[in-house]
């Protein structure tokens, strides 16, 4: 009897699974909001230099007298004239037509607050010579996500999924709330980094805790559900940001609910699979019997005992001798192969995804509308991905989503910018494919790595995704040399990654591996199967040769 048989004995997919999956997945609605929050909290409204304090606009000829025009005929955002360009002579003897000498906005800026009444940009003047600080805030958030994936992924394998999730909910709630009350830019960035750390871990542990409590045939459903919840979170952000335009209030609205998640997370049941992998049979038995009671299978749960578990889970008990370390990903050839291939998939997906998302302003429409469109395309894309995952397997779904995304982006690079509708449609289609790739890779990675190092593997994969999101803005700078160069790079990487997917094994209908030995056995099994097929193909040829020799 394997662990999957024990799950069936205590109810399979019952009341417990429905309750816990719902409670674990619910906070992901707001996780999506945090990931793209700065699209609204750090929005840049139209702005221009503030005229000198002693300026008299009625005498100088109006505001236009102080504002030079850019190449598009719009007022400059970061420069003003040193003196008005028409009107009576100025105090320094300037003629009516002015000197046309410009200077930076030494008296500050005037912002158009009609759409965004308050953002971190307007509050701390993150424009012009300070505009890099706006991107720095988002980069630091991504650094936090990177650190969280590594640190908490490791801790979850050591301490358990439940304990780390409880800590993450509290950290997200506290750091997000503190960011809303940040007195200055530096404090804001510190708390955003802490939020990024905890949110990365929530995403990873949410998938793992749910998958480890589900039978084999339902794991794809859970992965797809999590993907849909994330997409719905993008819709939610558009609505919340529209209703709560002040950045501090918006930051609070998406952070405070994590206090609720922190409270009810104490009722989560730790993964019995993790307990058994840690050699804690007493806790494994307690967890399974508790699940059996919730699922109405109390009699079946009563049949379980320490001896039954010891007999049934001999393989899992071998893990109690010691957990695998992160270095095992590089030491063991089997794990190293998985690590390198999956790292490429994670990097390519995130790299291309953020390459598209960071160009949202190029659509020239309302940011709220863009948020809705990019959330809407995920729904049909992930549904198609779900069908492929369940019918054809994880590997074809992963390969197709990356390949189609890369093709859409590459084609976009050769279409003239005047064809706005075509370019926008391709970008939306490419984004949908990349969203499907994210949906698939979370499930695929969790099924490929053994229990002993599953969280560490997911954490390292998420780390590579964050590296991709950090590198992506740097690639966008190549547009200065050739406008379509970023699109060619963003498209080529997922195409190459789709080919790498062919080097990974299929996991459809396979039990979750618990040890590295399971991976080796799976690999040897496939090699033996291939050899048997080759022998079957050779037998008719050998028989034909013997007949000819007999003649």
UniProtKB/Swiss-Prot annotation:
What is the reported tissue distribution? Highly expressed in kidney; in the particular segment of the proximal tubule. In kidney, found preferentially in the cortex and outer medulla and weakly in the inner medulla. Expressed to a lower extent in brain.
Q: What SUPFAM superfamilies is this protein classified in?
A: MFS general substrate transporter (SSF103473)
| Keywords of the record | Cell membrane, Glycoprotein, Membrane, Transmembrane, Transmembrane helix
Post-translational modifications: Glycosylated. Glycosylation is necessary for proper targeting of the transporter to the plasma membrane.
Residue ranges for the region (Disordered) are 514-551
InterPro entries to which the protein is assigned, alphabetical? MFS_dom, MFS_sugar_transport-like, MFS_trans_sf, Orgcat_transp/SVOP
Coiled coil feature spans? none
Q: How does it sit in the membrane?
A: Multi-pass membrane protein
Name a GO CC annotation attached to this entry.
protein-containing complex
Task: Please state what the annotation says regarding this protein's domains.
Answer: Multiple cysteine residues are necessary for proper targeting to the plasma membrane.
Protein's UniProt name: Solute carrier family 22 member 6
| Organism in which the protein naturally occurs | Rattus norvegicus (Rat)
Instruction: Identify the taxonomic lineage of the organism of origin.
Output: Eukaryota, Metazoa, Chordata, Craniata, Vertebrata
């Amino acid at each position: 009897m394997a662990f999957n048989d024990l799950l069936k004995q205590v109810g399979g997919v019952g009341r417990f699974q429905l309750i816990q999956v719902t409670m674990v997945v619910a906070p992901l609605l707001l996780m999506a909001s945090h990931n793209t929050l700065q699209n609204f909290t750090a929005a840049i409204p139209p702005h221009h230099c503030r005229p000198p304090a002693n300026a008299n606009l009625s005498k100088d000829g109006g505001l236009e007298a102080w504002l030079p025009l850019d190449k598009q005929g719009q007022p400059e955002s970061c420069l003003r004239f040193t003196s008005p360009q028409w009107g009576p002579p100025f105090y320094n003897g300037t003629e009516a037509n002015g000197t046309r000498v410009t200077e930076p906005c030494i008296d500050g800026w005037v912002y158009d607050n009609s759409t965004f009444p308050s953002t971190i940009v307007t509050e701390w003047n993150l424009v012009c010579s300070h505009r890099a600080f706006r991107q720095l805030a988002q980069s630091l958030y991504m650094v936090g996500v990177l650190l969280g994936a590594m640190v908490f992924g490791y801790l979850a394998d050591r301490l358990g999924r439940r304990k780390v999730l409880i800590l993450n909910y509290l950290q997200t709630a506290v750091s997000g709330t503190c960011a809303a009350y940040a007195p200055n830019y530096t404090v804001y960035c510190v708390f955003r980094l802490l939020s990024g750390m905890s949110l990365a871990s929530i995403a990873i542990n949410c998938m793992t805790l749910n998958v480890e409590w589900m039978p084999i045939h339902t794991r794809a459903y859970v992965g797809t559900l999590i993907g849909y919840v994330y997409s719905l979170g993008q819709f939610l952000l558009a609505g919340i940001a529209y209703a709560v335009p002040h950045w501090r209030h918006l930051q609070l609205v998406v952070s405070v609910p994590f206090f609720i998640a922190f409270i009810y997370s104490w009722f989560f049941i730790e993964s019995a699979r993790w307990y058994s992998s840690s050699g804690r049979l007493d806790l494994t038995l307690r967890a399974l019997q508790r699940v059996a009671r919730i699922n109405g299978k109390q009699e079946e749960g009563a049949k379980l005992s320490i001896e039954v578990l010891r007999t049934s889970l001999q393989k899992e008990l071998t893990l109690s001798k010691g957990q695998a370390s992160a270095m095992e990903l590089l030491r063991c050839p089997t794990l190293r192969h998985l690590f390198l291939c999956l790292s490429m998939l994670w990097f390519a997906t995130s790299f291309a995804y953020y390459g598209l998302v960071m160009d949202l302003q190029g659509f020239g429409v309302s940011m709220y509308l863009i948020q809705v469109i990019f959330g809407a395309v995920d729904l049909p894309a992930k549904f198609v991905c779900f069908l492929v995952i369940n019918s054809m397997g994880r590997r074809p779904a992963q390969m197709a989503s990356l390949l189609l995304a890369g093709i859409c982006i590459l084609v976009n690079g050769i279409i003239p910018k005047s064809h706005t509708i075509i370019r926008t449609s391709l970008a939306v289609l490419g984004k949908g494919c990349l969203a499907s790739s994210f949906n698939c890779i979370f499930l695929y990675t969790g099924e490929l790595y053994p229990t002993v190092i599953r969280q560490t593997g997911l954490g390292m994969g998420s780390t590579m995704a964050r590296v991709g999101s950090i590198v992506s803005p740097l690639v966008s700078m190549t547009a200065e040399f050739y406008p379509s160069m970023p699109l060619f790079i963003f498209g080529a990487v997922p195409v190459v990654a789709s080919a790498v997917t062919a080097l990974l094994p299929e996991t459809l209908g396979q039990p979750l591996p618990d040890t590295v030995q399971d991976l080796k056995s799976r690999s040897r099994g496939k090699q033996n199967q291939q050899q048997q097929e080759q022998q079957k193909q050779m037998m008719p040829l050998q028989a034909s040769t013997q007949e000819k020799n007999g003649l």
